[in-house]
Amino acid sequence: MQDLINYFLNYPEALKKLKNKEACLIGFDVQETETIIKAYNDYYLADPITRQWGD
């Protein structure tokens, strides 16, 4: 997941296309892609002190 976050940070236009459903991640269907984007948003928008991935 960290690799995906780094990719989104380096290529924000790719994230924009994913959010607009103009693209999807290879190997993931649209629903899985939406789940990944939600996880990214939840992580990225979280307070840096409380940022952590699930156990």
Curated annotation (Swiss-Prot):
Assigned keywords, A-Z: Competence, Lipoprotein, Pheromone, Prenylation, Secreted, Sporulation
Domain of life where this protein originates: Bacteria
Pro-sequence residue ranges: 1-45
Primary site of residence: secreted
PTM: Trp-53 is modified by farnesylation, which is essential for activity. Modified by the tryptophan prenyltransferase ComQ before export to the extracellular environment. The type of isoprenyl derivative differs among the different pherotypes and depends on ComX primary sequence.
Function: Part of a major quorum-sensing system that regulates the development of genetic competence. Acts through the activation of the two-component regulatory system ComP/ComA composed of a sensor histidine kinase, ComP, and a response regulator, ComA. Activation of ComA leads to the direct regulation of over 20 genes and expression of over 150 additional genes, including those involved in competence development, appears to be controlled indirectly. Under certain conditions plays a role in sporulation.
Subunit record text: Interacts directly with the sensor histidine kinase ComP and stimulates its activity.
Protein name: ComX pheromone
Organism: Bacillus subtilis (strain 168)
